[in-house]
């Protein structure tokens, strides 16, 4: 949908003219999966697929939201209404409402209503952080339209708080940080323990990143995700009987080997090994980027997928098929699942002149093995949320 079409949709929905158009990206994570809530490092970037919002001011106290992606009516509530939406066909609005509620609770002045028409081109359920994209879109709209003096990282933290406390989903800080702090042509090397970060140019030369979506319709990700968070929490508790640590991200491989006897449980051993080794792989990957060693980066990305399959057990047939099929294709440096797991997407780093071949060959293998089509997208690395 182009900009004019978005304004037309706003007009059709609210019988008024929209004033401003905003965009908020999705994200991919090059490496560092399931490390954010374990206090480790991640290496994500914002992508050109994302969420658009057309804003228009109202002269009453009502917020009216409409999604071009959801079936249903306009969701309307007063700016002073702090209760999460309970009805199934209104729950999507909580990602927006939570940001409004928490900004007002922090004392920011949001003193009149508004309309917001929202449309996203992120494939649904692809694990490209549509929820963080929405939260940071709302944050940016409110920041700009109401002239809120809030630091971008504080806005990112409110995005995570919305996800955790208002929507009720466990998540680390990575998704909101990657979206909210995105920078064109750069990935973000982020320490999720301290929120120290640095931008690193994603210089891939003759290579590009291709996003491969499973198009899987149903996902166990939410329940399994919460299980993994709990398992890592239990592992941390056992290690803390001898180690002065606050997160698994503080441990290196040698410390893991030395103190693994404290875990004394096969599942906890595997989960902790992934958290520790994936964190170290992420640190090594950024060094490989600095050294211009793309082949090493590719090997680390492959190792990440293997660890997510065997130790963290979150990949599943669809994601394994995509990654393993990509490994067999010419010009591919590395491929792995990204996101929570079980469904969603994988990425491949592939030579630009082999990208179409990758999409065709992996697509054929996937269709034959899984029974329906995968989708492929070229990842363009873009800035965070902004007014267009």
Swiss-Prot record:
Chief subcellular location: cytoplasm
Residue positions of the active site: 175 (proton acceptor)
A Pfam family recorded for this sequence: GHMP_kinases_C
Taxonomic superkingdom: Bacteria
Coiled-coil zones: none
Molecular function via GO: ATP binding; galactokinase activity; magnesium ion binding
Positions contributing to ATP binding: 67, 125-131
Keyword Magnesium: yes
Cross-referenced PROSITE patterns: GALACTOKINASE, GHMP_KINASES_ATP
Assigned keywords, A-Z: ATP-binding, Carbohydrate metabolism, Cytoplasm, Galactose metabolism, Kinase, Magnesium, Metal-binding, Nucleotide-binding, Transferase
Pathway assigned to this chain's UniProt record: Carbohydrate metabolism; galactose metabolism
Residues involved in Mg(2+) binding: 131, 163
One GO biological process term: galactose metabolic process
PANTHER family registered for this protein in UniProt: GALACTOKINASE-RELATED, MEVALONATE KINASE/GALACTOKINASE
UniProt family annotation: Belongs to the GHMP kinase family. GalK subfamily.
Protein name (database record): Galactokinase
Biological source species: Limosilactobacillus fermentum (strain NBRC 3956 / LMG 18251)
Gene name as annotated: galK
């Amino acid at each position: 949908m182009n900009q004019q079409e978005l304004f037309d949709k706003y007009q059709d929905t609210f019988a008024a003219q929209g004033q401003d158009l905003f965009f908020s990206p999705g994200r991919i994570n090059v490496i560092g999966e399931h490390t954010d809530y374990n206090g480790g490092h991640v290496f994500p970037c914002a992508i050109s697929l994302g969420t658009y919002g057309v804003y228009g001011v109202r002269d009453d106290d009502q917020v009216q939201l409409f999604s071009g992606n959801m079936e249903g009516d306009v969701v309307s509530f007063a700016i002073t209404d702090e209760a999460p939406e309970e009805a199934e066909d209104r729950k999507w609005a909580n990602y927006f409402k939570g940001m409004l509620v928490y900004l007002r609770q922090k004392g920011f002045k949001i003193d009149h209503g508004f309309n917001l028409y929202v449309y996203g081109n992120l494939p649904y359920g692809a694990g490209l952080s549509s929820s963080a994209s929405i939260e940071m879109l709302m944050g940016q709209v409110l920041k700009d339209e109401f002239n809120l003096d809030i630091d971008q990282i504080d806005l990112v933290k409110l995005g995570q708080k919305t996800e955790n406390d208002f929507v009720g989903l466990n998540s680390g800080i990575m998704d909101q940080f990657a979206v909210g702090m995105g920078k064109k042509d750069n990935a973000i090397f982020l320490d999720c323990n301290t929120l120290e970060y640095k931008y690193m140019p994603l210089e891939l030369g003759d290579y590009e990143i291709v996003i491969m979506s499973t198009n899987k319709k149903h996902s166990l990700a939410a329940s399994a995700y919460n299980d993994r968070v709990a398992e890592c929490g239990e592992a941390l508790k056992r290690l803390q009987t001898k180690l002065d640590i606050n997160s698994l991200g503080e441990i290196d491989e040698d410390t893991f080997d030395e103190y693994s006897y404290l875990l004394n449980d096969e599942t906890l051993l595997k989960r902790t090994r992934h958290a520790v080794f994936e964190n170290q792989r992420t640190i090594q990957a950024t060094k490989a980027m600095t050294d211009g060693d793309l082949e090493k980066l590719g090997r680390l990305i492959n190792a990440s997928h293997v660890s997510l399959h065997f130790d963290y057990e979150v990949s599943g047939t669809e994601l394994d098929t995509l990654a393993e099929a990509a490994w067999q294709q010419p010009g591919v440096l590395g491929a792995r699942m990204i996101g929570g797991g079980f469904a969603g997407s994988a990425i491949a780093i592939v030579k630009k002149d082999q990208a179409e071949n990758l999409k065709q060959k992996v697509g054929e293998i996937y269709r034959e093995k899984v029974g329906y089509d995968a989708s492929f997208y070229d990842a363009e690395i873009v800035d965070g949320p902004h007014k267009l």
